[in-house]
């Protein structure tokens, strides 16, 4: 570990006066109380309890949000790691950075659908994709769980449910509940804004099986479920059975440096007192993506921070002019909030939520939950960690070129295109040149502005009420 970065992370995660992570206290029902719990008491001073039908006595404790943070370098070395908020009081306490899995939300989009879409040559920087649901209500693919509950239809099979047109809904929705405006958007814009309607179309092109195989086997996200997580909802929207750990997610984002993946490790070797090797690190390194795809993805994820439309717009670290990339993520019902960010030196994953998953908007306002707490904590850490480091750039790939594209067609700009912007493309997979007869100019947002094999069958979880994540 790097003592400077570890110290900075520990100080940040003390979270003095809830500086980064609001508490969001709420009552939690448990079957036993420990000395460390903040027990809920009645007005008369007696413990608040409830007795179940089977005689079980339930107690209540006040719990607050927790957080975890882990930083790696691009050789897989664990630079710093903190597994919880506040002062550490136990040597073997729960470490949420490597010992607890969480649903990824949208942080899985770039490492799966988008990366493979670029790698396979299915999409590029400016591929136009429709901002609308993949499945419409009339397709009768996705159940409307709320409607089914209200009308006593939960026990019906899909075949039986076909008799109830209102028992279905369009899918996916974007974060906030909208279904998109039906316009065509360039891929970079959909990724920067974390639009589910755009990501799901890329995922449908790549295929859920291909995405799962890549993130499970190549990126070693081994806590994903090989049976229940092979579907677009899980592989694009991040609604997995168990999810992944912050350390595993940080390791997966290593690939946006130069395409290489290295298993994370805490040591290189351990020697005994005589200098003999007692333990040797068995980390493995290999090329997960081509360097060309990695650099295109790096530029795409830069937009999350540097574009005026990015979900973390303007929240990049001020570190001697060094660039950064990142991805926000929110799991179902605001139960898990994420940010994974990279600089030329480090890649970091930050998680914020409750130990027992709970809708954070029930204890915090939606604005509080969406103030990008995780990205601001990452920004503060990187500004400290990189304060004295010399300038370093991400490695550009010789197989990637900058080209102007037509903002109306997404093709390379032709002589008659009235509105153009700059994109990054693999030199061996350039779009055609636009020859369309254009109407009125429509300028896309400037990305530089500061501030599956054949598509596989979608596997839909039994409960589809929480499939729309950020």
Pin down the residues of each PLM region.
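Non-catalytic, structured segments within soluble enzyme domains
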Residues: 1, 7, 221-222, 234-238
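A penicillin-recognizing enzyme superfamily signal
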Residues: 2-61, 65-71, 78-83, 87-100, ...
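Secondary-structure transition/capping motifs at alpha-helix termini
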Residues: 73, 88, 118-127, 222-226, ...
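Surface-exposed aromatic
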Residues: 92-97, 230-236
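Conserved catalytic neighborhood of penicillin-recognizing serine enzymes
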Residues: 122-211, 232, 273-303
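Short, charged, amphipathic alpha-helices and their helix-cap/turn boundaries
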Residues: 206-224
């Amino acid at each position: 570990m790097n003592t400077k970065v570890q110290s900075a992370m520990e100080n940040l995660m003390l979270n003095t006066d809830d500086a980064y992570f609001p508490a969001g206290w709420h009552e939690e029902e448990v079957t036993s109380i420990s000395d460390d719990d903040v027990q809920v008491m009645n007005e008369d001073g007696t413990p608040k309890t409830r007795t179940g039908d089977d005689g079980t006595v339930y107690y209540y404790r006040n719990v607050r949000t927790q957080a975890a943070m882990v930083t790696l370098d691009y050789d897989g070395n664990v630079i710093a790691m903190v597994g919880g908020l506040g002062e550490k009081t136990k040597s073997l306490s729960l470490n949420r950075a490597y010992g607890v899995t969480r649903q990824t939300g949208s942080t899985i989009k770039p490492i799966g659908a988008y990366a493979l879409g670029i790698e396979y040559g299915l999409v590029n920087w400016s591929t136009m994709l429709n901002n609308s649901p993949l499945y419409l209500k009339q397709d009768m693919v996705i159940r409307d769980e709320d409607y089914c509950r209200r009308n006593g239809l939960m026990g019906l099979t899909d075949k039986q449910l076909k008799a109830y047109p209102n028992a279905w809904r369009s899918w996916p929705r974007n974060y906030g509940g909208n279904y998109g405006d039906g316009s065509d958007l360039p891929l970079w814009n959909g990724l920067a804004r974390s639009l589910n309607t755009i990501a799901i179309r890329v995922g449908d092109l790549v295929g859920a099986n291909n995405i799962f195989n890549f993130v499970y086997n190549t990126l070693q996200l081994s806590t994903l479920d090989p049976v229940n997580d092979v579907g677009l909802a899980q592989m694009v929207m991040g609604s997995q059975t168990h999810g992944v750990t912050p350390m595993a997610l940080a390791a997966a984002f290593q690939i946006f440096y130069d395409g290489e993946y290295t298993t994370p490790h805490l040591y290189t070797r351990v020697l005994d007192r005589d200098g003999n090797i007692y333990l040797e690190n068995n980390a493995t390194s290999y090329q997960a993506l081509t360097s060309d795809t990695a650099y295109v993805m790096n530029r795409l994820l830069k937009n999350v921070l540097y574009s005026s439309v990015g979900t973390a717009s303007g929240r990049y670290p001020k570190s001697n002019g060094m660039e950064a990339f990142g991805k926000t993520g929110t799991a179902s019902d605001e139960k898990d909030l994420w940010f994974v960010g990279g600089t030329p030196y480090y890649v970091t994953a930050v998680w914020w939520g409750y130990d027992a998953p709970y809708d954070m908007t029930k204890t915090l306002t939606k604005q509080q939950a969406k103030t990008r707490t995780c990205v601001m904590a990452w920004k503060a850490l990187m500004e400290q960690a990189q304060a004295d480091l010399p300038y370093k750039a991400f490695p550009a790939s010789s197989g990637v070129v900058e080209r102007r594209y037509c903002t109306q067609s997404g093709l390379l700009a032709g002589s008659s295109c009235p509105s153009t912007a700059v994109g990054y493309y693999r030199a061996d997979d350039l779009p055609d040149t636009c020859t369309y007869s254009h109407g009125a100019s429509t300028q896309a947002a400037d990305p530089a502005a500061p501030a599956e094999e054949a598509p596989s069958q979608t596997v839909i979880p039994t409960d589809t009420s929480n499939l729309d994540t950020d």
